[in-house]
């Protein structure tokens, strides 16, 4: 157990344990984002949205959000993304190169957990970039991409919790929320009772929610 401030709302606290901590840590610790960095985040679920906020809090100058759901992209914009790309309509790597004057992103955060999104992450990165893989593909699935995408001194990092330190970072994230620097309220897309849990899973599978809360009366 990690103690947090007493005035921190418990419904918001329930978000910290996995998605928010992973995305924030992926940007701050694993991604090592610095002021003025250009950042590419693919996947705008709760993990990706938290990574976008981590990039904003780190001082990134360009934050490119990529998803296939326009509602999620709108949410990403409200959390700090400076540019949105719907990759059903555009090639994310090509648009990123245009937005970064041909360079590519300094830091890339993959939060979609798909074979194609991992390849797109590498394609969008500049030589010497740090590519952080937060998403998880189905267990046992093989990842295939051209070897040349690993060239150019790119550093590829795989982390499940963003290299976060719960005893330090839980209280820090609570403070960031209470001082209105971390946005959590819009991440709660739905509140439902336990007997409606299957509806929550259906909406999650459709990509309609960032996070659902199960309320026990």
Residue ranges and their predicted role:
Residues 48-49:
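N-terminal Rossmann-fold NAD(P) dinucleotide-binding loop
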Residues 41-44, 56-120:
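Adenosine-nucleotide cofactor-binding segment
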Residues 1-42:
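NAD(P)H dinucleotide-binding glycine-rich loop of Rossmann-like/cofactor-binding domains
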Residues 129-130, 154:
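Glycine-centered, small-residue-biased loops immediately flanking beta-strands
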Residues 135-153, 170-173:
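Rossmann-fold NAD(P)-binding glycine/threonine-rich loop
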Residues 69, 137, 162:
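Residues in the short beta-alpha loop(s) of Rossmann-like NAD(P)-binding domains
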Residues 36, 81, 104-105, 184, ...:
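Local beta-strand N-terminus motif with an aromatic residue
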Residues 119-123, 127, 167-217:
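C-terminal hydrophobic helical "lid"/dimerization subdomain
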């Amino acid at each position: 157990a990690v103690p947090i401030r007493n005035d921190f709302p418990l419904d918001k606290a329930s978000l910290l344990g996995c998605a928010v901590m992973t995305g924030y840590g992926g940007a701050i610790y694993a991604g090592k984002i610095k002021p003025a960095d250009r950042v590419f985040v693919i996947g705008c679920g709760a993990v990706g949205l938290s990574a976008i906020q981590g990039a904003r809090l780190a001082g990134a100058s360009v934050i490119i959000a990529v998803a296939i759901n326009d509602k999620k992209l709108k949410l990403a914009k409200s959390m700090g993304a400076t540019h949105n790309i719907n990759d059903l309509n555009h090639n994310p790597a090509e648009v990123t190169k245009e937005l970064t004057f041909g360079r590519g992103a300094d830091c890339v955060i993959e939060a979609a957990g798909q074979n194609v999104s991992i390849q797109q992450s590498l394609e969008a990165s500049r030589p010497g970039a740090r590519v952080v893989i937060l998403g998880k593909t189905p267990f046992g699935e093989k990842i295939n991409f051209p070897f040349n995408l690993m060239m150019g001194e790119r550093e590829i990092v795989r982390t499940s919790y963003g290299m976060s330190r719960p005893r330090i970072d839980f209280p820090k994230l609570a403070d960031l929320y209470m001082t209105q620097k971390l946005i959590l309220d819009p991440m709660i897309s739905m509140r439902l009772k336990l007997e409606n849990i299957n509806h929550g899973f259906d909406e999650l599978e459709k990509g309609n929610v960032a996070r659902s809360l199960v309320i026990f009366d």
